[in-house]
Amino acid sequence: MFEKGSTAVLSTSRLPFIVAVKNAGLYSFEKGEWLLQYPLSHSIYKLVGISPYIFGIGDNGLIVRYNPYNNKWTHTFFPTPQRLWDITGNESGIIITHVGSKLYISYNFGSNWSVIHPFKELSIKPFIRSLFLYKEHLYIGTQINRESGGLWSFSLESGELTLVKKESNSMISSIYIDCEDCMFIAKGNARSKEGSIEMKSLRGSRWRTFEQTISEKAFLDVFNVGKNLYTTTSKDEYGYSRIYEINKQRHILLPIETIEGHGFRGAGCKDELFISSPIESKWIDRSYEMTKLVH
C-alpha cells in the first residue's frame, strides 16, 4: 500500500508521526504500525502543528485541518489549480499560506481567510515557495526569479516589504529560525547544481554557508528535532537524495542517510527520524542506528 512513498510528515505530542501518503491520505505511524487517519486522493506537501490544530496544504489549492476539539479532519480548496508548498502560523490563531505571489491569511485558525498581496509594488512578482512567521514578521522565500527572487520580510503590522537576501538564480525552499534567533535557509537550483544551507543571525547581516562534502542540486527542507537540525535534498543523477545533520557550531553538513527520490520533508521524535519521499518513506531510529524502509 505504501510503495508510492509519502510527501509530508509531522511529529506530534500525541502521535510520533503523521504521514501524508502519496494520493492515499493521512496515516499515523508508530514503531512500524500504520493507521489510516483521513483518506484523501490529493497529495499534501507540508504538515504543520499550530497548537492545538494541525494543518496541511498541497495540490490544487488543498488545505487540510485537524480540529482537536471534535477530533475531526476536514479539507477544502482555495480557488487555484496551483500546488501549495508551505504554511505557517502561531498559537494566537494566525495561519498563513500562499497561492502564486499572494498570501492567504486567517486570524482564527483557518475559519475565515483574506488575501494579502505582499509584492503589489513590484513590477515582476515572484512566486512564493516557503514561509516562516516570526513574531510580527513573515519571512517569504521565492521560487527562482531573476528580477525579484530571494528572501523577503513582510510586516503584518505595517505592510512593509523588505528584501533580506537577493537570489537571482536559486529558489529558497525552506526557512527556519531557532530559539537563538538564527535563521537558516535551504536553497536550490537543479540546473546549476548550486544547492546550499545558509545561516545568519537576525541581529546581523552576514550570511554563512555550511560546508558540504557532496554537491547537491537543491536542499528542500530544514527541520528540528529537539536541539538538532536536519535537512533533506533533491535526488541526484542516480535517483537518491540525502539527509544531513546541520552542525551549527562547526558550520558543516554531516550526511547521515540516503533515500530514493526527492527528500520532500522530514520530522523527528526523540531519537527517531522520518523522511518522506514520493518513492519511499524511511524511518530512522538513531538510538540503535537502525534504518527501515516503510514503503
Each model region followed by its residue ranges:
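Entry beta-strands of beta-propeller and related beta-repeat scaffolds
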Residues: 15-19, 53-56, 93-96, 137-140, ...
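Repeated scaffold domains used in trafficking and secretory/extracellular systems
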Residues: 3-14, 42-50, 81-91, 124-132, ...
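An edge-strand/N-cap motif at the start of beta-rich repeat modules
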Residues: 1-38
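Blade-level signature of beta-propeller repeat domains, shared across WD40, Kelch, NHL, RCC1
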Residues: 261-295
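Conserved Ser/Thr-centered positions that define the repeating blades of beta-propeller domains
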Residues: 28-29, 65-67, 106-107, 153-154, ...
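Solenoidal tandem-repeat scaffolds enriched in leucines and small polar residues
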Residues: 109, 113-178, 184-194
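Residue-level signature of beta-propeller blades and closely related beta-rich strand-turn architectures
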Residues: 23, 60, 100, 144-145, ...
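A short beta-strand motif characteristic of beta-propeller blades
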Residues: 1, 33-38, 72-77, 113-121, ...
